[in-house]
């Protein structure tokens, strides 16, 4: 398979815009909010004093924002494929 065939199979994705950023921020905030109450064993790693959340440390923040980025990327690709954002 040559490179031109592979490139033709890849869908055209949107460039970075303010709507893309807003979708990613919303997805991350939703996952942080859900993770705050859904994570049962928390507070085992270093805490983040700037947030002021008891028992919500660095491992929990990394886990929830990782999930937020996965959901955000899926939402951006999905909304781009049905032409809601471009």
Swiss-Prot record:
Positions of transmembrane segments: 15-35, 57-77
Extent of the signal sequence: none
Keyword terms of this UniProt record: Chloroplast, Membrane, Photosynthesis, Photosystem I, Plastid, Thylakoid, Transmembrane, Transmembrane helix
InterPro entries: PSI_centre_PsaK_sf, PSI_PsaG/PsaK, PSI_PsaK, PSI_PsaK_bact
Superkingdom: Eukaryota
Chief location category: plastid
Topology versus the membrane: Multi-pass membrane protein
GO cellular component terms, A-Z: chloroplast thylakoid membrane; photosystem I
GO terms under biological process: photosynthesis
Pfam families referenced in this protein's UniProt entry, alphabetically: PSI_PSAK
Compartment list: Plastid, Chloroplast thylakoid membrane
Family stated for the protein in its record: Belongs to the PsaG/PsaK family.
Name of the molecule in the record: Photosystem I reaction center subunit PsaK
Species in which this protein is naturally found: Gracilaria tenuistipitata var. liui (Red alga)
Encoding gene, per UniProt annotation: psaK
């Amino acid at each position: 398979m040559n490179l031109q065939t592979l490139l033709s199979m890849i869908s055209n994705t949107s460039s970075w815009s303010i709507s893309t950023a807003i979708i990613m921020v919303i997805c991350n905030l939703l996952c942080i909010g859900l993770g705050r109450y859904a994570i049962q064993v928390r507070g085992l790693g270093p805490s983040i004093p700037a947030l002021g959340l008891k028992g919500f440390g660095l491992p929990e923040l990394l886990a929830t924002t990782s999930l937020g980025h996965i959901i955000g990327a899926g939402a951006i690709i999905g909304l781009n494929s049905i032409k809601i954002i471009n």
